[in-house]
């Protein structure tokens, strides 16, 4: 019986579709496999479709500035101008991130022009060409929107860190806080700037794509201002100007190699490539002495017999509102560093009324937090109005602002919280002005075994009225 002889056995063919090199335009051969131009085009289409889907999935749901502002109002008291500025800056930042994701996916999709198209590719070529044509006709198509990192100016305890935390919550992105004073130049003892990115990656549970949309708050940024004076050349400023130089690239946007564990000082570490263009950096600091620089500049501007000297009576927060890049440069920030923080917002010093509102009004106000803690033990915790105002007064005198409120309440309630779990008959604790000032202790209302529930509530009300009357 005769054998069928095939003369195509030695002819190179595509490993994927089986076509020979004579049936396709181009055949790319490898050591153990080959692929034709049609299969390559199909693979590119598949990858392009996945990129578009990934862009849609990874794009953040973007609340409008007014919605961000309303959310901040629920948790942050006062600072209206700062909240408005931050709402707009965050909206524009993540709008840019979403726009870049979409443009990147469309650019890859638009590059898939192949003459040997399959029927599926031919169907998809029309919208692809339409997008490409639309993009070529758009005069703004090649415009790149720069990052809008944020600089917060204001004294300690006015809510700079808390505002950044609230922004991360409303955007549902990873968030990390770092202290600029712990950062040093690469090669010196301390944390280098890549450590900040490593912490953000950990906050994102190792998800690089999610970390690339996170928020990093760098506190005490004023502490890395370059030193000035006669002795600047004696010792190297490893935690000042050098850190600013190291931060420039990641603030602007770069591909950084971030160690998954340990630090860059440990060799042979696994690293992740992180794109910092989508990371929002918020830098905050008290900038003590900056108001003097502004006042001096304004004084130089208005000289002569007809000069207006109203600037000498301006408050610090009013002076900070007039800060410009030259003032920050004279303070010690590099001009390049200032340029990468284009959005500047000033937070005003909090008043007694502001602190009183902070204690009671926000969704997670401190008073509500302690009331919830006491409620777990079945105890009703009450603060009189005079007590709340006394807490605010002490915080103002100490110069700690909102940051010091918790420590004052802790000190006031410490003995009560120590004894309370062992006292089964206490049903109400009343904190008055005297107990906040330390001249007395919080009032404990005990429940007698034979007292009906209705009479107990009356007794609680009477005791609270007596305390309020005594304070008045």
Curated annotation (Swiss-Prot):
Question: Which keywords does this chain's UniProt record carry?
Answer: ATP-binding, Chaperone, Metal-binding, Nucleotide-binding, Zinc
Q: Region Disordered: start and end of each range?
A: 107-139
**Is Nucleotide-binding included in the keywords of this UniProt record?**
yes
Record-listed ATP binding positions? 155-162
Q: Which residues bind Zn(2+)?
A: 14, 17, 36, 39
Q: Which domain of life is it from?
A: Bacteria
Compositional bias segments (type: Polar residues): 109-131
The ClpX-type ZB domain sits at 1-55
Give any Gene Ontology cellular component.
Answer: HslUV protease complex
The protein's matches in Gene3D superfamilies, at most eight in alphabetical order, are given as:
1.10.8.60, ClpX chaperone, C4-type zinc finger domain, P-loop containing nucleotide triphosphate hydrolases
What's an example Gene Ontology biological process for this entry? proteolysis involved in protein catabolic process
Give one Pfam family.
ClpB_D2-small
Tell me, what is one Gene Ontology molecular-function annotation carried by this entry?
Answer: protein dimerization activity
Q: Where is this region: Insert?
A: 105-135
Q: Give the family this protein belongs to, as stated in its UniProt record.
A: Belongs to the ClpX chaperone family.
Q: What does this protein do?
A: ATP-dependent specificity component of the Clp protease. It directs the protease to specific substrates. Can perform chaperone functions in the absence of ClpP.
How does it associate, per the subunit comment?
Component of the ClpX-ClpP complex. Forms a hexameric ring that, in the presence of ATP, binds to fourteen ClpP subunits assembled into a disk-like structure with a central cavity, resembling the structure of eukaryotic proteasomes.
Q: Which PANTHER family match?
A: ATP-DEPENDENT CLP PROTEASE ATP-BINDING SUBUNIT CLPX-LIKE, MITOCHONDRIAL, ATP-DEPENDENT CLP PROTEASE ATP-BINDING SUBUNIT CLPX-LIKE, MITOCHONDRIAL-RELATED
Name it. ATP-dependent Clp protease ATP-binding subunit ClpX
């Amino acid at each position: 019986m005769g054998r069928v002889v095939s003369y195509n056995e030695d002819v190179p063919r595509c490993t994927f579709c089986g076509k020979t090199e004579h049936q396709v335009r181009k055949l790319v051969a490898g050591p153990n496999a080959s692929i034709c131009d049609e299969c390559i085009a199909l693979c590119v289409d598949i990858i392009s479709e996945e990129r578009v889907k990934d862009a849609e999935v990874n794009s953040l749901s973007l609340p409008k500035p007014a919605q961000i502002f309303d959310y901040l109002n629920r948790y942050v008291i006062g600072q209206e101008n700062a909240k408005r500025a931050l709402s707009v800056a965050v909206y524009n930042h993540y709008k840019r991130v979403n726009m870049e994701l979409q443009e990147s996916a469309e650019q890859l999709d638009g590059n898939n022009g192949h003459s040997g198209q399959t029927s599926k590719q031919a169907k998809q070529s029309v919208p692809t060409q339409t997008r490409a044509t639309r993009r070529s006709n758009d005069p703004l198509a090649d415009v790149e929107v720069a990052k809008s990192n944020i600089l917060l100016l204001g004294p300690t305890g006015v809510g700079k860190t808390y505002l950044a935390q609230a922004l991360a919550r409303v955007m549902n992105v990873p968030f990390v806080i770092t202290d600029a004073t712990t950062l040093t130049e690469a090669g010196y003892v301390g944390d280098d700037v890549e450590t900040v990115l490593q912490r953000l990656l950990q906050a994102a549970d190792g998800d690089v794509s999610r970390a690339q949309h996170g928020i990093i708050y760098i506190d005490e940024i004023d502490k890395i201002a370059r030193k000035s004076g006669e002795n600047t050349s004696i010792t190297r400023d490893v935690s000042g100007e050098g850190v600013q130089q190291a931060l420039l690239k990641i603030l602007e946007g770069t591909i950084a190699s971030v160690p998954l564990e340990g630090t860059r000082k440990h060799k042979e570490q696994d690293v992740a490539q992180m794109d910092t263009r989508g990371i929002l950096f918020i830098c905050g600091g008290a900038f003590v002495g900056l108001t003097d620089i502004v006042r001096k500049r304004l004084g130089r501007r208005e000289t002569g017999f007809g000069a207006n000297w109203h600037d000498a009576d301006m408050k610090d927060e009013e002076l900070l509102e007039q800060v410009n890049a030259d003032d920050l440069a004279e303070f010690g920030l590099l001009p390049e560093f200032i340029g990468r923080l284009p959005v500047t917002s000033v937070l005003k010093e909090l008043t007694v009324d502001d602190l009183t509102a902070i204690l009671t009004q926000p969704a997670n106000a401190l008073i509500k937090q302690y009331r919830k803690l006491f409620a777990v033990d079945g105890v009703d915790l009450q603060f009189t109005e005079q007590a709340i105002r006394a807490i605010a007064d002490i915080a103002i005198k100490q110069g700690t602002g909102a940051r010091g409120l918790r420590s004052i309440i802790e000190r006031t309630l410490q003995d009560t919280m120590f004894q309370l779990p062992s006292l089964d008959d206490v049903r109400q604790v009343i904190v008055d002005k005297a107990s906040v000032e330390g001249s007395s202790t919080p009032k404990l209302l005990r429940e007698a075994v034979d007292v009906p529930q209705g009479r107990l509530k009356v007794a609680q009300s009477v005791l609270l009225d007596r305390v309020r009357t005594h304070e008045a």
